């Protein structure tokens, strides 16, 4: 299976820009965010200048009922925005528990579904993705 790299998915409005120091820097369409990545124990690769371009950051707090909260540095659309993967559109928006509304690592599965749907010659079907945790 392909790794989730921009060059493997040129038609995806998502990019994992950097990871390190227990964080990940991600681009969802025009918006950039910092979220926790507990297994990213290595140093960050990009400069602090690049990380400071983030529009928001989600941090965990001990004792907080929700586990954490967002701090936004700029205004993002309250009702979310759309990002594209091939001919699929996903509505995304930061949630109170640190998610954005989709799991980019599911891209190989979406591509598999797209490729198999093409073989059905527009026959109507229903798909249930039981591996895409949605919260």
What is each of the regions a protein language model found here?
Residues 31-32, 126:
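Structural motif
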Residues 110, 115-116, 124-125:
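The AdoMet/dcAdoMet-binding core of the Class I SAM-like
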Residues 96-98, 132-135:
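Short acidic/polar capping segments at secondary-structure boundaries
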Residues 10-26, 33-104, 111-114:
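Non-catalytic substrate-recognition/targeting regions of SAM-dependent transferases
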Residues 28-29, 130:
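Single, functionally critical "micro-switch" positions that shape active/binding sites
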Residues 122-133:
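Conserved class I S-adenosyl-L-methionine
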Residues 1-8:
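N-terminal accessory targeting/assembly segments
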């Amino acid at each position: 299976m392909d790794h989730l790299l921009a060059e493997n998915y040129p038609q995806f409005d998502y990019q994992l820009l950097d990871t390190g120091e227990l964080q990940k820097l991600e681009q969802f369409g025009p918006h950039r965010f910092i979220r926790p990545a507990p297994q990213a124990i290595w140093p960050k690769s990009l400069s602090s200048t690049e990380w400071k371009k983030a529009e928001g950051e989600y941090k965990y707090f001990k004792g907080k009922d929700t586990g954490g909260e967002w701090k936004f540095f700029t205004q993002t659309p309250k009702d979310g925005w759309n990002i594209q993967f091939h001919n699929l559109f996903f509505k995304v928006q930061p949630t109170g528990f640190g998610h954005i509304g989709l799991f980019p690592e599911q891209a190989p599965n979406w591509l598999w579904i797209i490729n198999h749907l093409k073989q059905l010659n527009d026959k109507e079907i229903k798909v249930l993705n039981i591996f895409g945790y949605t919260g």
